[in-house]
Amino acid sequence: MSWLTPEVIDILLTVVKAVVILLVVVTCGAYMSFAERRLLGLFQNRYGPNRVGWGGSLQLLADVLKMMFKEDWIPPFADRGIFTLAPVIAFTSLLITFAIVPVSPTWVVADFNIGVLFFLMMAGLAVYAVLFAGWSSNNKYSLLGAMRASAQTLSYEVFLGLSLMGVVAQAGSFNLGAIVESQAHLWNVVPQFFGFVTFALAGVAVCHRHPFDQPEAEQELADGYHIEYSGMKFGLFFVGEYVGIVTISALMVTLFFGGWQGPWLPPFIWFSIKTAFFMMMFILIRAALPRPRYDQVMALGWKICLPLTLLNLLATAAVILYNAH
């Protein structure tokens, strides 16, 4: 078969990797919603979903079927085009980011030299999904939720980017694979501890997860910017939130905890174990912490996260200059 040139084989391998990663990430994100409900029940001394299938294992399938058969209703006062576009952006923005995450030394869909910048770009794109949803719904609660989400996300993306600059400076590259390889002897969480703390806080805020879920606070805004959504459009928002958790957890592992590196076990297994640990931490945070006021969330960012990131950058620069001489 003369058409099977090395270039065609590379393209086919990339497509296969992309499809596998897409299926794995979406499946993990979907089943994380089931795991969260079961674990929250355990933490709160009650039963979670346990009726559909063995131990509730088919609850996710029941939820998907329910969403598929619900009416895909668009309010007559909404802007139809933007209203439909918003959940698609919310679902795909952080999902595409997973393409640059190296799962193992040989398994990465897109090995960009600007991987860190690509992640920041896609995280910034997620803001538009919230803004479009809140504005196009033509609902005051949706708009208030979108305004909260935009201010919160844009603020915490500043700290998200600054927290990564120390890692980039220490590794000497924006490439995520090179950053993982630079942690062969010492994980970045040790010299970049302040950067990790800030990245973790900003990552939770970008995902709009508890305790940074003020944009969709049920008691104040009646579910915020996706109050008018139903059916599969709401399902895209719902699954997109958990896909974002999977992506942020994978990036924490890649940037601060050595990525695929570890003894004895295959690289993919190490990467999966570390990522699953941080996914469980998202659930534990939701179970353990209360929701603060919106002004307290913004104060945490500008009064604590910003000084921490600047201190981390100064310390990293001092260490690099000292080692250079």
From Swiss-Prot:
Major subcellular location class: membrane
Example GO BP: aerobic respiration
MF terms (GO), sorted A to Z: NADH dehydrogenase activity; oxidoreductase activity, acting on NAD(P)H, quinone or similar compound as acceptor; quinone binding
InterPro entries: NADH_UbQ_OxRdtase_su1/FPO, NADH_UbQ_OxRdtase_su1_CS
Membrane topology type: Multi-pass membrane protein
Pfam families xref list: NADHdh
GO cellular component: plasma membrane
Localization terms from the record: Cell inner membrane
Annotated HAMAP family: NDH1_NuoH
Summary of subunit composition and partner proteins: NDH-1 is composed of 13 different subunits. Subunits NuoA, H, J, K, L, M, N constitute the membrane sector of the complex.
Task performed by this protein: NDH-1 shuttles electrons from NADH, via FMN and iron-sulfur (Fe-S) centers, to quinones in the respiratory chain. The immediate electron acceptor for the enzyme in this species is believed to be ubiquinone. Couples the redox reaction to proton translocation (for every two electrons transferred, four hydrogen ions are translocated across the cytoplasmic membrane), and thus conserves the redox energy in a proton gradient. This subunit may bind ubiquinone.
Protein name (database record): NADH-quinone oxidoreductase subunit H
Organism: Sodalis glossinidius (strain morsitans)
Highest classification ranks of the organism: Bacteria, Pseudomonadati, Pseudomonadota, Gammaproteobacteria, Enterobacterales
